[in-house]
């Protein structure tokens, strides 16, 4: 698993927290010092906690489950989407749909509506509609795709969510907490870490800071997915050998043949 180092985090500016007056006292255990009115995060703890989170994410991925990435910050949308896509995980980078987790069946209906609209374009139904109706449906499809397209493959609730900036994504965190879904998060000095299962204390505003942490976590997820594939191949191979062994005719032992000969009637 790719390890994240103190130097990597330092170069990325992951140690810069917020102004002292904006801090959340619950983040005190993760703060190293104050400099020029700004809190400095303890990167030794950041590195260690990133490793812990990465290992947990690896195990989730290895079990074949999904992790939902969440970040609606403008400067972080692209990087979060890129990293989530690299490991085949769903993500939300537009406005968080209220009830995304707590009212998941309704969200799934909206996703299925996209598939229904796509079917209309394929079976020729569009040709029977007016231009105005086609335009309305096309706009509806575009809106659904923008907000929900990135979770189209999420057929059931995720097994965990990974959040960047727990203050901005507080609704997502709250919904996950209500359902008992583990929350992994990059938490800055102005945020409350108490509702987070796997805290990664770091600068959640700087693109580079978020990127290096996501790199480490996604590398672990990729390893988990690969290990699952290898185990599946090994299991299938073992099952195949077992089935072949069952099909093969059993050779009778010498004792069994002798016993059968003794039972045979002697010709007079």
Language-model segments: residues:
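Ribosome large-subunit tunnel/peptidyl-transferase-proximal elements
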Residues: 1-232
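Intrinsically disordered, compositionally biased charged tails
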Residues: 1-3, 223-268
